[in-house]
């Protein structure tokens, strides 16, 4: 059975379209509801303070007591590393203590956009 | 007189000792007894699960301190104060269950930060009225529920993942009560947690 030409064209366009731009405003909402149980922008809590995290080497937020694994990691937080971290922290840095996962790519992208914005990058 | 009441309240809040497991903690842990023993022999997975449980413990310790700060602030009136004390008791039971499970797995529970450290981290000095305290509690409870949901896929042991879901349900219940107390609308759409 042949698909109508118009439908094929629409599918081709959809496949070729770039991913939607990340939304930092939505990222803020997600950050507050998903990350806010343990993190704040400006205070070390269960997890480290996040302002300035984008572009920072892992394990270097001032005055936070990191796991040895994160302290010794060579990871620098940017799009790809933050995305990998939110997909599965243990896969990126075995021995870390976060273990919180964000399943949806668009949610991760928006959270990362917000962290980038709050880091002035 | 006010100070006496505050001190008695503090005694009440501090009364449930860390060393004695509550009935709920024992019940929660009872389901973990076998898996905890089995996990202890599975090194890497157990170590990761201990890490998750310790992060959860830090979160519960922060919640206990937050409710302590709220109760001692003098900003909460009855019946909100009683509800806050009850929710703090729930968090203490969570803490006790987590500590017992971490020890059962061969780990060392993380120590709690002082109330003063938590007050600074949560900017408790900015709390001026009951609504401010409820908003903080509401925010922390939602974050806690989402944290417990977000770590479920990372547990090596499915039994512990189930415990995480049970803890998330308690936090979601707290959030719902606080939301009603604040007269906020309930979520218009389903699946509002973990999203």
Regions found by a protein language model. Give the residues of each.
Chain A
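Bacterial N-terminal signal peptides
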Residues: 4-15
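C-terminal capping alpha-helices of c-type cytochrome domains
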Residues: 78-121
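N-terminal signal peptide c-region/cleavage motif recognized by signal peptidases
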Residues: 14-17, 22
């Amino acid at each position: 059975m042949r698909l109508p030409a118009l439908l094929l064209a629409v599918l081709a366009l959809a496949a070729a379209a770039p991913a939607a731009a990340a939304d930092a405003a939505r990222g803020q909402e997600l950050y507050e509801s998903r990350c806010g149980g343990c993190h704040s922008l400006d205070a070390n809590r269960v997890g480290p303070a996040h302002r300035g995290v984008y572009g920072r080497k892992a394990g270097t937020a001032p005055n936070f007591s990191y796991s040895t694994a994160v302290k010794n990691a060579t990871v620098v937080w940017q799009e790809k590393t933050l995305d990998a971290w939110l997909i599965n922290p243990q896969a990126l840095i075995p021995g870390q203590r976060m273990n919180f996962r964000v399943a949806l790519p668009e949610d991760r992208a928006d959270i990362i956009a917000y962290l980038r914005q709050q880091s002035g990058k | 007189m006010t100070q006496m009441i505050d001190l008695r309240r503090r005694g009440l809040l501090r009364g449930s000792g860390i060393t004695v497991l509550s009935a709920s903690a024992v019940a929660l842990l009872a389901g973990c007894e076998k898996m905890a023993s089995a996990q202890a022999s599975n090194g890497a997975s157990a170590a990761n699960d201990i890490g998750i449980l310790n992060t959860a413990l830090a979160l519960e310790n922060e919640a206990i301190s937050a409710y302590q700060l709220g109760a001692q602030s003098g900003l909460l009136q009855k019946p909100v104060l009683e509800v806050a004390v009850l929710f703090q008791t729930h968090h203490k039971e969570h803490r006790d269950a987590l500590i017992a499970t971490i020890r059962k797995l061969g780990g060392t529970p993380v120590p709690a930060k002082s109330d003063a450290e938590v007050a600074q981290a949560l900017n408790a000095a900015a709390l001026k009225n009951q609504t401010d305290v409820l908003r903080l509690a509401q925010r922390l409870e939602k974050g806690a529920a989402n944290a417990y949901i977000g770590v479920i896929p990372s547990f090596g042991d499915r039994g512990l993942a189930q415990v995480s879901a049970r803890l998330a349900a308690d936090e979601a219940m707290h959030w719902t009560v606080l939301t009603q107390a604040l007269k906020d609308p309930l979520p218009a759409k389903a699946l509002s947690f973990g999203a």
